[in-house]
Amino acid sequence: MKMIKVKVIGRNIEKEIEWREGMKVRDILRAVGFNTESAIAKVNGKVVLEDDEVKDGDFVEVIPVVSGG
């Protein structure tokens, strides 16, 4: 089984998600309860866009966005 490791920064969430062909960053965000407006992602240490594809074995860090006034 091919997997992607995911860690949500600032929360105690670390999990592995099964990788699928054509999987994108937005799919990973949704899998851990975020959308593209509520978090940004780094793949293997680089900030990425929601439409970027992820590969088997990638390490994804999800960084929740804090906003307000």
Curated annotation (Swiss-Prot):
Q: Where is this cross-link: Glycyl lysine isopeptide (Lys-Gly) (interchain with G-Cter in SAMP2)?
A: K55
Query: What name goes with this protein?
Result: Small archaeal modifier protein 2
Xref: Pfam families = ThiS (PF02597)
Post-translational note: The C-terminal glycine is likely acyl-adenylated (-COAMP) by UbaA, and also probably thiocarboxylated (-COSH) to function in sulfur transfer.
Naturally occurring in which organism (per UniProt): Pyrococcus furiosus (strain ATCC 43587 / DSM 3638 / JCM 8422 / Vc1)
Record GO terms (molecular function): nucleotide binding
Q: Where would I find the Glycyl lysine isopeptide (Gly-Lys) (interchain with K-? in acceptor proteins) crosslink on this chain? A: G69
Residues where Glycyl adenylate is found: G69
Q: Does the keyword Chloroplast apply?
A: no
Cystine connections = none
